[in-house]
Amino acid sequence: SRRASEEEARRLADIDHLTGCYNRRSFTAALGDLLTHLERREQALAAIAVDLDNFKQVNDLHGHQAGDEVLRNTAARIQRLLPDGGILARLGGDEFICVVPYHPKVPDRVDQLATRMIEHVARPVEYGDTPVDVTMSIGIASSTQMENARDGEDAAERLMHKSDIAMYHAKKQGKNRFYWFEPQMENELRFRNELEAGIRRGIANGEFRPYYEQQIDLESGKLVGFEMLARWESPEMGVVGPDIFIPIAEEIGVIGEMSEALIACAFEDAKEWDAELTLSVNISPVQMRDPWFAQKLLKLLVRHNFPACRLDIEITESCLHENVGMVRSMISSLRNQGVRVSLDDFGTGYSSLSQL
């Protein structure tokens, strides 16, 4: 009948086709209803945001069908653990969220559930003959942390947002763990987002500047060159040190662009020095994952007409373990052009020099 087919159409619009869970739209509506009818003293709701760690690697290594199998498995494992009245949704990609009722005086129940979810999802998923491993990060937010919890879908969105912020915090703390939402997490996240946006702007506006530290030969006491360091002269934040902006630039994928601009400036500066002095530059392990890194660097040397023999590239030991073949061929092509390549880990790395 027409009515039955309309209901079926509505049901299909409300579920995630891959896992059979709710989707974002139907979950938000259901959570809104639950919040509206909550008896505040006797009941609370915990929104539990779940995100798989390094899921992209599963797709890259094993293909999308393996990824889909992991998502279906994850949904089934979480669903089995949920108490009565719990609802699970897949929000998209590898993001899930569930809501569970609990007594506000017994939040440990929710802790236990989160711990079990993490344990169950970490068990390998069999895909063909290959066991596929994933872990997950969880953020939890409680209806007790909200004003105006009865605003239906609006309150649902706010509660979901809080659980998402806590989940992001769990990722930052090293993944494979859970955190309850705390208000300062919101400020940390806002600051982090401002930093990211500032770094992107700063690269475009040339706010990252090289400065130099002397390198002295310990035996002769003679100045042999300068090491290039970087600082960010930010109009909003003043001078920011590399310990803050380098890790973020690596994470958001702009370290290569930033480093090339700094090196280009440094080549121009170093042309003014005595021709005996070398320029030493630290290269991030993230840059060494770019198969074109050596080509880009050699191009910069030519463009700025800077002698390769005056350039000393310092890489860290960890670069060598990630992709020995590619790193080795990049180092060879740099050395063939006369660039010095040294390992910078203060004595720990020399065992790996033999690999080169």
Feature map (PLM): residue ranges:
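Short helix/loop segment flanking the catalytic signature motif in cyclic-nucleotide metabolism enzymes
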Residues: V70, I97-E119, I140, E147-G152, ...
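Conserved long alpha-helical elements within nucleotide-processing catalytic cores of c-di-GMP signaling
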Residues: R10-D14, G20-A46, D53-P83, A89-G93, ...
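Short catalytic/binding micro-motifs of nucleotide second-messenger systems
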Residues: H37, R80-G85, V106, M117-P131, ...
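Bacterial c-di-GMP phosphodiesterase EAL domain
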Residues: Q184-N187, E194-F306, T316-C319, M326, ...
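Catalytic core regions of nucleotide second-messenger enzymes
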Residues: A89-L91, V106-D108, V121-S137, G152, ...
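Cyclic nucleotide signaling catalytic output domains
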Residues: L88, R116, E126, T130, ...
